[in-house]
């Protein structure tokens, strides 16, 4: 995992923790900052290939961290997500 991907994972985890849903690609571009939504999507696909996140392409706000993703980010999952695992 690259430093940019680690930061992306941490930002997604913090966003989920604070709001209870995932950020959009445009929000990730603003929060990190990244140069484009395609850069965000590429890095999310890499995190998915590492087994750290899941999402449904083409569907808004379906990005979720896996148990391994939460552990890697060093952040406890929100209570509602922990009870679903």
Give the label of every model feature segment.
Residues 7-14:
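Pre-recognition alpha-helix immediately N-terminal to the DNA-recognition helix
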Residues 34-35:
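The short coil/loop that forms the "turn" connecting the two helices of the helix-turn-helix
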Residues 22-31:
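A short alpha-helical element within helix-turn-helix/winged-helix DNA-binding domains
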Residues 14-20:
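Short helix-capping/hinge SLiMs at alpha-helix to coil transitions
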Residues 44-45:
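Short, hydrophobic-biased segments on the C-terminal half of alpha helices
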Residues 5, 24, 56-79:
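Short, cationic-aromatic polyanion-contact patches
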Residues 48-58:
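A short, conserved structural fragment
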